[in-house]
Amino acid sequence: MAMMGQLWTNTGSALATLMFVYTIFKQFFPLFGPQLEPFLYRLFGRFYPYIQITFHEYSGEHFKRSEAYLGIQSYLSKDSSARAKKLKANTTKGSKSIVLSMDDKEEITDDFEGIRVWWQSKKEGATRQSFSFYPEANEKRYYMLRFHRRDREVIIERYLEHVMREGKTIEQKNRERKLYSNTPGQSHGNNSKWSHVTFEHPATFDTLAMEENKKEEIKSDLIKFSKSKDYYKKIGKAWKRGYLLFGPPGTGKSTMIAAMANFLEYDVYDLELTTVKDNTHLRRLLIETSAKSIIVIEDIDCSLNLTGQRKKKEEEEEDGDDKNTIEKKMMMKNEGENKESKVTLSGLLNFIDGLWSACGGERIIVFTTNFVDKLDPALIRKGRMDKHIEMSYCCFEAFKVLAKNYLDVEESEMFEEIKRLLEVEEIKMTPADVGENLLPKSEKEGGETCLKRLIEALKEEKEEAKKKVEEEEEEKQRKKEKVKEIEAEKEKKKKIEEEN
């Protein structure tokens, strides 16, 4: 027995010495490391009783974050603050408490059915360095699970399933809806191309200034979509739906998006096309969006050259080929910026309903525009933008919603006058302007004062509209007179030439 103990002691000492020598050798002769590592792994594997499993945040050629990694992250968060020695501290908006989580390069233990396992949070730096106007994170994160090889069957068959199930439960319990942005120049802390803040917009369909039947129609459409996973699979289409919101500024397009997100409890991705590098970058952004989300491109007419002024030859080609025939360069909001951007209309069309649009599911894509007539028909046809919603000027029903929201007033003698101005006189005022007039300017102002101010504003709008029409008529008349003068001058010259 003493001889056996001495043998193990000598073996341990020899292995320790060998590891020390290998570490020094690897430091001074790094080129030979890869050739020696397989041999050393086989050697130590005979004596090392533990198995390791690695879960990378991004694995292989996958663009999307690993669901296994995210599940483990949620699972370990429940008791890492009590077990880990190195913690990361963050604060949540609207709360004075500090949220603690497991720091990088930290280890905690976990017990399952009498078996102890070890979890490590690891991080590696990138081996290459490059300069780019579109910087990406230079670190790779992963979790490493270590357990005794005698417990292999239990860990693989039951423990990992337990971790994923519990992690998903914790994630759903703590889920906080987010507003994502792809604005460059922000530090994301990982490889994600999106940064986010908590989505806290209070808009709902109850507070939305719109006709009641129109709101009910939109809500029914959203409910039908959210429950149609099997139906979309049956008909062979990606589980997504496109909405086009169009109308003058101030008619509530952004508020509509917020109401949709709150109604469905979806995250919102605000996609700024002018900051996207190229079509590949656009696909990566799409892949990183989660299910149960709304992807928004606001003012789409300002992001791409979508005026529809295509050549006659292109208009005659079949619709199935429009992705190849209408490819155009991006129009920058500010010339001179983002000159490296190479996103094309073709790339955007593929983003909406091409092969890459099927990655994931349960997504709503929303375009907004002030000038729907300027958009290329190929972009907004059915199948891409399935539902077109006009966000128009304030009607009487929309006014009543605003009066309830702003003043908590449901009936007033002045309602009849406001109804006459909006419906009979057909005065055009946006919901934003109506709301501004209904907003009390001081604590002393009551509902009656605000309603009177709105009536005066509507009358002023009527006079301004009348004045504008008169000015347009005068301008038309001046143009007609100018044309007559030109024609008379031509006729005069013609007579002189004939006389000569």
From Swiss-Prot:
Domain of life, per lineage: Eukaryota
Database matches in Pfam families: AAA, AAA_assoc
Subcellular localization, as worded in the UniProt entry: Membrane
Binding residues for ATP: G247, P248, P249, G250, T251, G252, K253, S254
InterPro entries in the cross-refs: AAA+_ATPase (IPR003593), AAA_N_dom (IPR025753), ATPase_AAA_core (IPR003959), ATPase_AAA_CS (IPR003960), Mitochondrial_chaperone_BCS1 (IPR050747), P-loop_NTPase (IPR027417)
GO biological process, one term: response to abscisic acid
Cofactors demanded by this protein: Mg(2+)
Identification of the protein by name: AAA-ATPase At3g28580
Naturally occurring in which organism (per UniProt): Arabidopsis thaliana
Sequence ranges of Polar residues compositional bias: 180-193
Keyword line: ATP-binding, Hydrolase, Magnesium, Membrane, Nucleotide-binding, Transmembrane, Transmembrane helix
Stored CDD domains: RecA-like_BCS1
Gene Ontology MF: a single term: ATP hydrolysis activity
Family: Belongs to the AAA ATPase family. BCS1 subfamily.
Keyword field contains Magnesium: yes
EC number: 3.6.1.-
